[in-house]
Amino acid sequence: MKTQIKTTTILFTLLISMSAFAQTLKEARNFTDNEQYEKARGVFKLLLAKEPTNGDNFFYFGDLMLKMEYPDSAKILFQKGVDINATNALTHVGLARYYMYTWNDPKGAQEIAYAKSLVQTHAGKKGLDMAASRQVQIYLEIAETETWAVSPNYDDAINLTTVCEKLDSKNPEVFLVRGDSYYRKDPVNGTPAITSYNLAAKLDPKSCQANVRIGKLYANGKNMQSAIGFYNIAIKTDSTFAPAWRLKGEAQYSIMKFDSAQKSMATYLRLNDDPTARYNYCKALYKGGNYSDAIVQGNLALDKDSSITVVYRIIGRCYIESKTPDAVKSIEYFNKFFAKQKISGAPVVIADDYIDRGKAFSKNNQDSLAILDYLKALNVDTSRKDIYFDVATSYYKMKKYDKAAEFYKKKIDLNPANATISDWNAYGRTLFAQKDYANADLAFRKFTTMDPLNSIGWYWRGRANQYLDKELKSDSTRIFFETFFDLADKDREKNKKELITASIYLGGYFNVKKNFPCSKAYFQYSLDLDPANPANVDVKKILETDKDIKAATAADINTCRSTAAGGK
């Protein structure tokens, strides 16, 4: 009798222990979903200590590390799971997720194929029978993972949810994952995704996940009012779900409802004030263009946990992208980012990290360092040839005009049909600085053909031809400067420097042509525009000492015009 009571007591204790463990694993996943990452991490550490051979623990802990942007830590956990329990399909899904997160699709696909084979081996086999709920769990994680790839396999992900529906048609997760796959496959047509999300909501009306996803769908489509409406429905369903408040705040920021956004974010932080939450708030502020507040929140996140390396990146960007850039502070934070990243290996360095620091270096007139960073960016991502313009500009500032011209031309040659007036203007200016006036004029001609009402293109055609035709054999220079003059005279203050150059040339031109009234008119225009300009010292002498000009009556400048430049 005593033995029977003792056995019953042990079994009862075991059942309670197993139930507590199951709830704890569920709790850890709930913390993860609720973006309470520090709490989740604490629970996962306890789980690993309690059941160090349970592969699921390693999978979900590794997944948390990916969400926290610690891929190296995630890989260690996923690999440990495989080493400890190689027949647990989820551990292989974890490795697949890591590989696809780090752009290694082939290895990811191998792990997914192996995970599927494990499910098929265990499903329906005597002694190995895998429950339908377990098959669904694994297939849904595979489906989600397949949408992470560089070349996502959306169709297989959707097909897997169909398999899952046959196994368990009442599981709302099936329809959430299907909705995610549909939306990622076709972000323009959100109807299939919304249909799936609504099915999930019907199956689990106490969950806010479906309406949060519908809200995100509308937010991605820039329909913020509808997005906020669905976030409100989600919050009404579960007011403790922190991400709904964060997403609502982000949507409110994007439509400049700043007071409402701050209230939403305050609730988000009240529900979840761990360092990652502060990081998420910082990121939302940055995306909304609220750089000063993003810097404040970023530093608060770092005060809580200085190991969140990505925050240094965001603050560095804020300083260089603000209306009043602080290049020195931007460089400081990017330097900290690179130093921390080198130690932790996370997050992955991307081309934009070097590009943004390069822009800060250039803004701080450290263009040799800027060029080094731009070239590092190209090593990281060879497709980022859009930075050729930035490289060229730094070379131009350093007066290395040959290298500047080389990179401006590279930028143009990427797609000549899409070259902008800025491209042609910069290229022409660089050739002009090299005294290659003929090719400079060709570049400026492209400029004026594309935008004939932009005065600066005509100005630079005049400057180039001024050197090409020093003996005034052609009227081209005159025509270009006159066309510039007509366009620029409407805003004299803005164009003062260039107007003085053009009017002095035209004054000299008419003097040589012995049209003294027009010569006097242009010289007088230049002097009146800015008497203190050094170029007008000689102009004043000419007006006072040249007997022909002195004797002439200044003409109305409008009567001195020739025909417009047209197709010259």
Predicted regions and their residues:
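Bacterial N-terminal signal peptides that target proteins for export
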Residues: 1-10
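Alpha-solenoid helical repeat scaffolds
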Residues: 14, 19-513, 534-550, 562-568
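C-terminal interaction modules of eukaryotic adaptor/scaffold proteins
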Residues: 517-523, 527-536, 542
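Flexible, disordered linker segments and immediate boundary regions flanking tandem C2H2 zinc-finger modules
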Residues: 551-556
